[in-house]
Amino acid sequence: MASISDDGMALSGNLKKLKTMKKKFFVLYEETSTSSARLEYYDTEKKFLQRAEPKRVIYLKNCFNINRRLDTKHRFVIVLSSRDGGFGIVLENENDLRKWLDKLLVLQRNIANSNGTAHSPYDQVWQVVIQKKGISEKVGITGTYHCCLTSKSLTFVCIGPEKTPNGEDRVASIEILLTTIRRCGHASPQCIFYVELGRQSVLGSGDLWMETDNAAVATNMHNMILSAMSAKTESNTNLINVYQNRPDLSHEPMRKRSSSANEASKPINVNVIQNSQNSLELRSCSSPHNYGFSRERCDSLPTRNGTLSESSNQTYFGSNHGLRFNTISGIRPHSTNKHSNSPTFTMPLRCSESEDSSISVDESDDNGSFSHYRLNTRTSETAIPEENIDDFASAEFSKVTEPNESDENYIPMNPVNPTDAIHEKEKADLQRLEDASLHFNFPEHASEKLAKDFDLDSDNQCCRPIRAYSIGNKVEHLKFNKRLGHLNDTGQNPNRVRAYSVGSKSKIPRCDLQRVVLVEDNKHEFASNRSQSSIGKEGSSYGSSANRQKKSTSAPLLSLKNQINSDRMSDLMEIDFSQATNLEKQKFIKNNEIPKYIENVFPKAPRTDSSSLTLHATSQKDIFNGSKLNNTAITSEDGYLEMKPVGNGYTPSSNCLPIKVEKLKLSDYQTTAPPLLTATAAPVQDLNKISTYNISAEKWREQPSRSEEKKSNSPLNDNPFSLKPTNVESKSKSHDVHSANQIDCEKVCVQSDKLNNLTDKIVENNNLDIGGHEEKKLVHSISSEDYTQIKDKANDFTKFNEAGYKILQIKSDSSLISSKLYQKGMHKDNLERTHRLTESVNTIPDNATATVGSSSLTKFNINSVKPAADSRSTGTDPSTAQNILQIKDLNFPSRSSSRISQPELHYASLDLPHCSGQNPAKYLKRGSRESPPVSACPEDGNTYARIDFDQSDSSSSSSNIFNT
């Protein structure tokens, strides 16, 4: 080895070049005034002595890293990394390696110090070739790079020019944090190493594929980078690694990843760090120089105050010792922290506290004595009780004697009796200490006000440290006062409460709410409590919210469990679909005085002051609108559909059925009366469009022949009708037709039981619709057994000039099948239907006129009609079948009319088709099976009926009804 000359030569010797493993003569020069520090090598020592040109000169100022390389098959290798590439030197032994490496590092540090730059060496440096794959070409990082590893990041340094031969720019240097690397791996046969980056990396998400010199380098890169990613501790400096001869960092403990489990599931750390001379500062060991401590990522703890027995890796302080230590449960040294110094609170698990969601080990650097609380690093205060301190029993301080301990700051965990006066002095002293810490200086909120708010209930605070609430909020003090019997008013106590879900705060059964809360305040009103809003009706207010004036809050205050508060549901919307009580129904029925001898489905309503009993052919919307305008006594139950079973003794609900079932005056049906039905629906020329019953206009003009012959033999021939042809185009005669069409069914009061039985079975066709509807409608069958009448007390009806009730029963049978209007081949079926129709149907002439005396009533003449098919077959005049209603799409279901054999019926209100003003139809009395629905409500078109959903069959329906 040559000696150091005057030109600054420091070391020289025959070493091997890593790439070729050939011996070369290397000379290391220090920095001089004329030249900088450099490393030169020659082919032989002879050429060096001959002052020949060196084969290569490496300036140390261009080397960004000099370290030992451990990934080759040679043990003692030093690598100098620069922008021109890496240069490796293979030495013969460890001593030579340390001598050359130390000298190189000293010269490098001197250069960095002279330039005023900080030298940050890399732990590992590999030379790789990044392939054009993944995101490399997108971000411009392709070609030969140095892959430099540190404890925090992975840096790629460009080798060679910063432009590709194609003229594309290359990234000179880029640093990727290890925390943004999702995974890494290698392929041994192909010498490929890849890294998958996450979205938070500087390059974005994607893969980087790089090629190494050999498979050993790829394996070493994988192990080193993965160990650095998961290592718990930082790697040491290169110099320490070199002198300790540590091949890699794989033996280091793995770094703990972030965990969401609780402390009970975490492994126990048995390392107890103590220092009896000075208090140690515990910090997160992210610095590479903190060799004694391990770095941990933040752990997601349960969001509540943890007790000392379940918390690990936290800092505790002893009041008599100036040191800190990191410990866990079960290994706490008894000499430094006593068992009595555990101010833990038992908090309910349902409550959460955001300030203890994660535990930090960063503490202050003071060396004074500390209290026995587990310090919370996010606030300046000490341990904080839960915000709902009323969920557990309030505690007071009790005196616990302990040697060398002060009793002022001790917090016992014993329950206390609020009425005990022994500890009043201790509470007063502690309250003064607590008031001393209340120093608030906010511009919007005076400190006196906040101090007063915290002093509302000193006993409930339990003399514990005050919670750091946000500005303007207060502590809840209600439950403790309620236990003492002092229930604060809602408006005067705007304390902070917890929000509850809908219905969760109701402490009494729902039936009690209906009986007490909803009905007790309004015993004489029949409107139920819907949505707690006032239903305006002539200025009156319904429901229990009528007397409320306080505005509901978003989080209502809780009340006592044994007290029914009228404001319990003040902030919630509750819809009550229950019916009124039976007592209310009985009162309502008694006030309206419904006759007992009438089988009612609809309640009686008082007669309003209307000008005339005009029948309106309106829609369902007009019916309900008219009922609202004409009668202001409608309850809030009008829209309900009563579906309860009806028996003999059943009284329907008075709140769920529409009112406006008016009694008919006998004088309204006189022939001299003005017309009662106004033609407003359809023109005259549309007479043939009558719902699904296509009745031609010529049929209405035919002279009745057979009905006149049967008229004299009718048992109701007291007041015969004048049978005249009806001219539908004449206005005056149209009024006569309409007046005849308005007569629903007069209730005849006679002494003969036969007459009563006959008039009980009269059915009239009042539902012919000329509104132009060509759509098919469901054909219903009407049983006249449901037409009820007043069997006695005729004097009462004559006195009040009223007619009785009439109830329709519409029997909807599944056998009623409607076919198309213009279906072919229906002539034969129509003949059969007409034959069946005329055998049991009695008709009434067009113009039914009668004179109503002061003491007599109008009686209908029921005429027996022979089958129309017979008249056609024998060649009789077609006028003999003048009033037979031709029905196209009608099947005839059988229905039993026996009241005793009927099953239990379910009733509902039904809006039936109505008659228009141009209806020229006579009141055709037909059998129950063939009759369409008939209007039952005289004044405003309210047509209601009972619906029988029974599917039973009986063929004796019409015969039982019309057996005269």
UniProtKB/Swiss-Prot annotation:
Biological role stated in the UniProt entry: Activates phosphatidylinositol 3-kinase when bound to the regulatory p85 subunit. May mediate the control of various cellular processes by insulin-like peptides. When phosphorylated by the insulin receptor binds specifically to various cellular proteins containing SH2 domains. Involved in control of cell proliferation, cell size, and body and organ growth throughout development. Also has a role in a signaling pathway controlling the physiological response required to endure periods of low nutrient conditions.
Gene: chico
SUPFAM superfamilies xref list: PH domain-like
Biased composition (Basic and acidic residues): 698-712
Bias type Low complexity, positions: 952-964
Record-listed Phosphotyrosine modification sites: 410, 907, 944
Organism: Drosophila sechellia (Fruit fly)
Start and end residues of each PH domain: 8-109
Sequence motif YXXM motif 1, location on chain: 410-413
Residue numbers carrying Phosphoserine: 286-287, 342, 554, 928, 931
Cellular component terms per the entry's GO annotation: cell cortex; cytoplasm; cytosol; intracellular membrane-bounded organelle; nucleus; plasma membrane
Keyword vocabulary terms for this entry: Differentiation, Growth regulation, Oogenesis, Phosphoprotein, Repeat
Compositional bias ranges of the Polar residues kind: 528-560, 713-729
Molecular function terms, GO-annotated: insulin receptor binding; insulin-like growth factor receptor binding; phosphatidylinositol 3-kinase binding
Protein name, as recorded: Insulin receptor substrate 1
Name of one Pfam family that matches: IRS
Locus of motif YXXM motif 2: 640-643
Alphabetized PROSITE patterns for the sequence: IRS_PTB, PH_DOMAIN
